[in-house]
Amino acid sequence: MDSLTPTAPETLAAAVVTTLAVDADPQAREASIFYWERGQGHRKAVVEAAGNTGDAETGRLAAELRDRPADPRLHHALTRRLVLAAERGPTPALTTLFDRAWQAEANSRLGYHLGRSYTATGQASLTSGELRGRAGGPRLAEGDTPEVLVVIPFRDRGSGQRLRNLLACLQALRDQTAPRGFYRVMVVETDERPRRREVIEPYTDHYLFAHKPGTFNKSWAVNVGVVNAPGSAGCVCILDADVLADRDFIARNAARFRRPGVMGHLSYRDMWCLDETSTSRAIDERLWQGVGRAETDGLRAFVLRRPPGCCVWVRTSAFHRINGMDERFEGWGGEDNDFAYRMDINSAFDHYDDQLLHMYHPSSAVLREDGELVNAHIPALSWGPSDVPIGDPDRFVSQASAVPNG
């Protein structure tokens, strides 16, 4: 092993187990199809080496883990087996496995977290119906002048998991240490019709429907929210509807703008994409049990390393300086990268290491036949100030007659 490779058996064993789980678990691909596809070559080398260690028990555990990648008992058993084998004196086959596993980890943007108390059982999936039964929480009072605007773009044409996540997100935002009059939450639902309006309105300060048939356009939805929100907030939080915020979320991130020159920031380094069991557990802890932050020991997550979006904080002036988000992006992929790049070039843009929990929902992401994101044809950093106004809520209204209500 070279000097860039760790020598602790526990670290190397964890790299093996993580790589096998990420390769076998379909939820890893759902967490990020782009990151998952990019790491296939390194992972396949680990899978091959795990089956050729010369130790029958290691091979059996590795095979069972690939069959049941969410089983924490197998994770712990295989980790222990590999550590014991290393402590007895590594064989050439084990050294090869560890080398390949570390190369896979070092070249992957998709990691793994398995809490010590995660069980995968005993936690029923929470539904949007259960969240609809909860009180809406404190609202803005007449005369409040919020300094922070939280914009949440949203669409759910499916079974309601995204709606479940949005309601959990909104209810967590009503439970904050920041004074209630300090921040406004705005949901922009873009669809053929306002499918979820009646459910959403009790939990948000401002709801706006913007007609948009066809594919989801996050950039346009965000711009619609920022441009058309009431008031004159000094900063904007662009927040995905699947984020479960902790209780200090608003206060902590708003305070970061008190530093001289700061125009925006990403509040996190890594995004934890929870599985369904962990999502329901985290929601239960955060909302029903009233904890300020979900305990990570009970969670299982695929960890996206340094993703660019999901939760971005910017001064309103900086947002308009770069003409908001690029509205040419349709569908999933690339718009967050582009916005972060332009913020970084045009302003002092910071990065922090807060916990970011992303609640589970089936992925709608796809790649082109060449393996690139669907928006890869859009030149990076090519969006900027223009005579055409951004955030026009009627931009797609002309398509209404061509698309029936669904």
Predicted features by range, described:
Residues 158, 179, 188-198, 243:
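A conserved acidic beta->alpha catalytic loop
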Residues 168-182:
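Short, acidic, metal-binding catalytic loop of nucleotide-sugar glycosyltransferases
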Residues 232-244:
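Short beta-strand-to-loop acidic/aromatic patch adjacent to the donor-nucleotide binding site
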Residues 246-327:
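Conserved catalytic core of nucleotide-sugar-dependent glycosyltransferases
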Residues 201-217, 228:
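Conserved donor nucleotide-binding strand/loop of the catalytic core
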Residues 2-129, 162, 306, 316-317, ...:
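C-terminal catalytic/acceptor-binding lobe
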Residues 220-235:
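Active-site nucleotide-sugar/metal-binding loop of Leloir-type enzymes
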Residues 147-151, 338:
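Cell-envelope/extracellular polymer assembly enzymes that use nucleotide-activated donors
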